[in-house]
Amino acid sequence: GLLTSFNGDAMYDLLAFHSKPAYAWQYVSGTLMHGSKGAPIWFLWVHLLLNGLMILPFGGLLERKRGSRQVLIVFVTATVLSSIVFHFLTQEQDIQATGISAVGYAFVTGGVLILPKMWKEFSLTVKWFYLFLIFLSGLMLLPVITGWISTLLHLSGIVSYLLVFIGSKGLKGGS
C-alpha cells in the first residue's frame, strides 16, 4: 500500500488484515491502509479515490442526519465485521488485504436510506452526483469487476449499516 511505498513490506505485514491474524489490532488497522503488496501505485490511488467518493459525501450526509456517534458506531461495526468476514473467507489461505470499502458501503447504505427524506434540499447537480455515486457503488458490487471476496466484504458493509440502523431503532422503541 501507500505505507509500503515508503516503509517496505514489514509495515504492510504488521498492519494489514490477515487471513491468519497474529495481532488483535489487525482486525482494525487494515481499514486505515490501502492497496496490496505489488499493486501498481495507480491502483492504490484509484482505490483510495473510489473509497473517498463513497465515504466523504455519504459519511457527511450521515453525520448531518444521524450524528457523529452513529457514524463512529457504523465505522467500527463495518471495520470489525468486514475483518471477521475476510478472516472466515480466507482462513485456508495465507493472504493479506487492506481497505476501507466496507465502511464506504455502510455509509452509502445509510445515505441511500436518508436521501429520499432530503431530496428536495439538493440542487439538480447534487442529485446527479449522488445518483452517479450510487451507480458506481453498485458496479463495484459485481464480482466480475471486484472478485468474490471483495464483493462479500462490500456486502458486509451494507449489513453493518443495517445492523446498526435496526439496533438503534430497537433501542429507541422503534421510533
Describe these PLM feature segments.
Residues L49-Q70, F107-W119, V159-L171:
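Membrane-interfacial alpha-helical segments at the cytosolic side of multi-pass membrane proteins
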Residues G1-A97, P143-I149:
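N-terminal TM1-TM2 helical hairpin plus the immediately adjacent luminal interfacial "cap"
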Residues T79-V80, A106-T109, F132-G138:
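Small-residue-rich segments of transmembrane alpha-helices in multi-pass membrane proteins
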Residues T4-S5, D9, L61, E121-F122, ...:
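Residue-level signal for well-ordered alpha-helical segments
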Residues F17, K120-S123:
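Short secondary-structure boundary/capping segments
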Residues Q93-P116, L153:
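Membrane-interface micro-motifs in multi-pass membrane enzymes
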Residues Y23, R69, I84, F88, ...:
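C-terminal transmembrane module of polytopic alpha-helical membrane proteins
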